[in-house]
Amino acid sequence: MGNFILHPIQSRLIVISYSILILILPLYALFSYASNASWSLILEKATDPIAVAAYTLTIKMALYTAIINTIFGFIIAWVLTRYNFSGKRIMDAIVDLPLALPTSVAGLALSTVFGRNGLFGHILDFYNYEIIYTKRGILLAMIFVSFPFSVRAIQPILKEINKEEEEAAWSLGSGPLETFKRFIFPIILPAILNGFTLTFSRSLSEFGSIVMVAGNLPLQDLVSSVLISQYLEQYDYIGACVISIIVLMLACSVLLFVQIIHSLVVVDSK
């Protein structure tokens, strides 16, 4: 069987066509449908107090999640890369578990553990501390579903670090902290930013687990994805499209900001 080689023009055509079909066309349809409404209606839907509260809560929880998972993701990646211990392979496999679980199953699992009658819920209830059906439940759900991204972004870079160069830094009198600060951290910083971006994006789009662990009450713990679902259930397609576009624009703004920082970091490291 001969080698299957595509002409460069054919390759570009396939890539462009696939991108248009999967990415551009759905977004165009979203903007096109929203454009059928009057500007006054779009403004009314976009600035509705319930919608504004949902944007704010969603962005805030996604940022908190990205910060938390980036910190702990680095720690876990460091342990999995630098240490050998029994059960290491099992722990490494467990990291990817949230990617395999349906989000509704994740929500049910979290409710079973942290609900009022759950494994830890009754202990938390004794201290009048609730997680499920509160904003804490949203944060917990986002942390769970986006947990693997920072670990998997940082782990390969840590594996590629030249141990001989690291040992050379130690031999020159640099302590472990100084070696990490001057040698290791600049190398892994782009990966940390990538992990942060992936975690933030995944958290922003979460729906299945949040709808099960949050109270989904307007102006309290209602996130944008659930609000969009509620609009669709009410056959308010214009409202759903407007909210979707606003969330998309907010997400793109944050991601653009992170990418600018990433570019500056890469330039400085060269």
From Swiss-Prot:
Transmembrane segments: 13-33, 61-81, 94-114, 138-158, 180-200, 208-228, 238-258
Start and end residues of each ABC transmembrane type-1 domain: 55-256
CDD domains according to UniProt: TM_PBP2 (cd06261)
A Pfam family per the record: BPD_transp_1
PROSITE patterns: ABC_TM1
Record's GO cellular component terms: plasma membrane; plastid membrane
Predominant place of localization: plastid
Membrane topology: Multi-pass membrane protein
Keywords from the UniProt entry: Membrane, Plastid, Sulfate transport, Transmembrane, Transmembrane helix, Transport
Keyword Secreted applies: no
Entry's Gene Ontology molecular function annotations: ABC-type sulfate transporter activity
Organism domain of life: Eukaryota
Compartments, as annotated in UniProt: Plastid membrane
Known function: Part of the ABC transporter complex cysAWTP (TC 3.A.1.6.1) involved in sulfate/thiosulfate import. Probably responsible for the translocation of the substrate across the membrane.
Family statement drawn from the similarity comment of this UniProt entry: Belongs to the binding-protein-dependent transport system permease family. CysTW subfamily.
Protein name, entry field: Probable sulfate transport system permease protein cysT
Source organism: Helicosporidium sp. subsp. Simulium jonesii (Green alga)
Species classification: Eukaryota, Viridiplantae, Chlorophyta, core chlorophytes, Trebouxiophyceae
